[in-house]
């Protein structure tokens, strides 16, 4: 993994200026991967001098001294230009998150922070179930106001599809019907995609068709969804 130099700060400055001049509600988030980075493209930036090792790879990269201190250095450099600071981590570690937050807030007390509750972590390898449950609340107390799971949808959709395929293979339509019953039950909690035609806006386009007089081709009025899902 390579580290982006802090000399890239003019890019943040330009983005901040453009957003402010245009009056656009833009959120600029600065991310650093310096916690795990092992290489950096050059050694000419004075802000990198404490972390560049004077040893180069065959491709010309400099070796980089990674870790939380490098993340803090970059975070402090990014803070004047970024709405959110995000340091990417290798494990879910509250102590590490606190060290970063404390160092940033000592200089920029109102700086908002971001944290990736990554699906690349084996969560139960590092935290108990109770610790997993309180992890994000503890992050919030430290100033991590934007917390997210990258690729949560990818993992949930693939697991759900795999489990449905297993049930369908073993039990045919009974396997699908069981999932459908869970959909019906979930409607009480706000789930809406039982009626997939409605969910994708078919009713809206039916209204458009009716408004222009093309009523013979509307989809919802005679559909099985309209007849069977109420």
What are these language model-derived features?
Residues 119-121, 129-130, 134-145, 149-230:
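Extended, intrinsically disordered, low-complexity segments
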Residues 2-9:
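Short, small-residue-biased leader/transition segments that mark boundaries at the very start
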Residues 32-36, 90-93, 117-121, 153-155:
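Active-site-proximal loop/turn and secondary-structure-junction residues that shape catalytic pockets
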Residues 62-74, 83-96, 148-150:
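Catalytic beta/alpha-barrel core
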Residues 29-72, 119-131:
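Active-site mouth loops of central-metabolism enzymes
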Residues 15, 78, 139:
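Conserved, mostly hydrophobic/aromatic
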Residues 26-32, 85-87, 111-117, 146-150:
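Hydrophobic faces of well-ordered beta-strands that scaffold small-molecule active sites
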Residues 12-21, 98-109:
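Surface-exposed amphipathic alpha-helices with a cationic face
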């Amino acid at each position: 993994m390579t580290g982006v130099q802090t000399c890239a700060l003019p890019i943040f400055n330009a983005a901040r200026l453009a957003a402010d001049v245009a009056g656009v509600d833009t959120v600029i988030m600065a991310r650093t991967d310096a916690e795990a980075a092992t290489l950096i493209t050059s050694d000419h930036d004075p802000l990198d001098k404490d972390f560049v090792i004077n040893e180069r790879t065959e491709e010309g990269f400099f070796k980089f001294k990674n870790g939380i201190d490098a993340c803090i250095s970059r975070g402090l450099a990014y803070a004047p230009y970024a709405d959110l600071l995000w340091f990417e981590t290798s494990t879910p570690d509250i102590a590490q998150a606190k060290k970063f937050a404390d160092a940033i807030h000592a200089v920029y007390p109102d700086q908002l922070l971001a944290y990736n509750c990554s699906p690349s972590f084996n969560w139960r390898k590092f935290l108990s179930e109770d610790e997993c449950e309180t992890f994000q609340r503890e992050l919030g107390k430290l100033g991590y106001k934007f917390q997210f799971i990258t690729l949560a949808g990818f993992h949930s959709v693939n697991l759900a599809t795999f489990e449905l395929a297993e049930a369908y293979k073993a039990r045919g339509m009974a396997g699908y019907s069981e999932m459908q019953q869970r959909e019906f039950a979930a409607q009480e909690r706000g789930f809406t995609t039982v009626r997939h035609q409605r969910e994708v806006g078919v009713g809206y386009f039916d209204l458009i068709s009716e408004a222009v007089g093309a009523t013979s081709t509307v989809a919802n009025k005679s559909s099985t969804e309209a007849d069977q899902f109420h």
